[in-house]
């Protein structure tokens, strides 16, 4: 016969676990909102920066300009910037991006191209360092909602690697935020910058909304057509010098965007995982409660049978 006290203790344990998972789900939902607000708040700056870049680009013959960040060279070594999270309990978020990075590293090795990692997030750092992978720089313990200062620090390291020709190309491997239940690990070239592709034609922003008591994501296409500055605008400095100064800023902005998307993907994955855990806890509580009631009924029936048997014996 099942132990009633043991079942009762398990029910209480599952109840306590459900409280924790539900709290984590709500915290993740609140942080997803903050991540979305941050993406929205940085967009005006990004659009203005693109206006200036396009205007300068139209006034220069880029193939003749000395712009190190746009210069293509023979690729002998690739820097792989991998962005993961610091924590677990977020489904397959970290595992998927690490798998994507490993696959890309194998492709480069098969092509006879060297590579080295720049790792963002404790999960990536632990995984690749434990496997003695070539690592140039690591970043862990960043804010869960990324800041421009953090993106700038990482961008400075990438610029140093690229301009010193320690690497000839830098690729970004991060998770693109698609929806609360879906994320997409992607590989994107960061350096050298391609002036013809300063904007992503699939650029979108996302809004977290509540509908029918459940969280949903609304995505909105962002206009990628950038208006040029007035033709009669005069730049006091040489446009080439201005462009050389603005391109690192553009790189930092692109990196901040990737960090924000990665953070939103991680939080959404954690929210979904905790929601599933809460649902599973509810189902387990129902099963345990049913088992408890059956055990109680069996115990009562046995006691009655023993009383009746004792009475008959008299």
From Swiss-Prot:
Signal peptide residue numbers = none
The record's PROSITE patterns line, in alphabetical order, gives: ATPASE_GAMMA
Record membrane topology: Peripheral membrane protein
Keywords from the UniProt entry: ATP synthesis, CF(1), Hydrogen ion transport, Ion transport, Membrane, Thylakoid, Transport
CDD domains recorded: F1-ATPase_gamma
Q: Name one Pfam family in it.
A: ATP-synt
Per the record, the major location class is membrane
InterPro entries of this UniProt entry? ATP_synth_F1_ATPase_gsu, ATP_synth_F1_gsu, ATP_synth_F1_gsu_CS
Protein location: Cellular thylakoid membrane
**Record's GO cellular component, any one?**
plasma membrane-derived thylakoid membrane
Give any GO molecular function from the UniProt entry.
Answer: proton-transporting ATP synthase activity, rotational mechanism
The subunit structure is: F-type ATPases have 2 components, CF(1) - the catalytic core - and CF(0) - the membrane proton channel. CF(1) has five subunits: alpha(3), beta(3), gamma(1), delta(1), epsilon(1). CF(0) has three main subunits: a, b and c.
The record's similarity note reads:
Belongs to the ATPase gamma chain family.
Q: What does this protein do?
A: Produces ATP from ADP in the presence of a proton gradient across the membrane. The gamma chain is believed to be important in regulating ATPase activity and the flow of protons through the CF(0) complex.
Q: What is this protein called?
A: ATP synthase gamma chain
Upper classification of the organism: Bacteria, Bacillati, Cyanobacteriota, Cyanophyceae, Oscillatoriophycideae
Q: Name the gene that codes for it.
A: atpG
């Amino acid at each position: 016969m099942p132990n009633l006290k043991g079942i009762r203790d398990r029910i209480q344990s599952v109840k306590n676990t459900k409280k924790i998972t539900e709290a984590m789900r709500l915290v993740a939902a609140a942080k997803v909102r903050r991540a979305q607000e941050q993406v929205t708040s940085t967009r005006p700056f990004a659009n203005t920066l693109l206006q200036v870049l396009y205007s300068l680009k139209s006034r220069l013959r880029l193939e003749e300009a000395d712009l190190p960040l746009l210069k293509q060279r023979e690729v002998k070594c690739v820097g792989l910037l991998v962005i993961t999270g610091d924590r677990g309990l977020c489904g397959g978020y970290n595992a998927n991006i690490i798998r994507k990075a490993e696959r890309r590293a194998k492709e480069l090795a098969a092509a006879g191209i060297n590579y080295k990692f720049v790792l963002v997030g404790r999960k990536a750092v632990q995984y690749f360092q434990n496997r003695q992978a070539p690592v140039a720089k690591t970043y862990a313990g960043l804010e869960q909602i990324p800041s421009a200062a953090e993106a700038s620090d990482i961008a400075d390291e990438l610029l140093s690697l690229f301009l010193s020709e320690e690497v000839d190309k830098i690729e970004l491997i991060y998770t693109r935020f698609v929806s609360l239940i879906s994320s997409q690990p992607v590989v994107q070239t960061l350096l050298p910058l391609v002036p013809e592709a300063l904007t992503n034609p699939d650029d979108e922003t996302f809004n977290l909304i509540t509908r029918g008591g459940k969280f949903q994501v609304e995505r909105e296409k962002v206009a990628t057509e950038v208006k040029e500055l007035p033709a009669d605008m005069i730049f006091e400095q040489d446009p080439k010098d201005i462009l050389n100064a603005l391109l690192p800023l553009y790189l930092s902005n692109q990196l901040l965007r990737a960090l924000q998307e990665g953070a939103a993907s991680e939080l959404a994955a954690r929210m979904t995982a905790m929601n599933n855990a809460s649902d599973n806890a509810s189902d387990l509580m129902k099963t345990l409660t049913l088992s408890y009631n059956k055990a109680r009924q069996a115990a009562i029936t046995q006691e009655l049978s023993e009383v009746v048997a004792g009475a008959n014996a008299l």
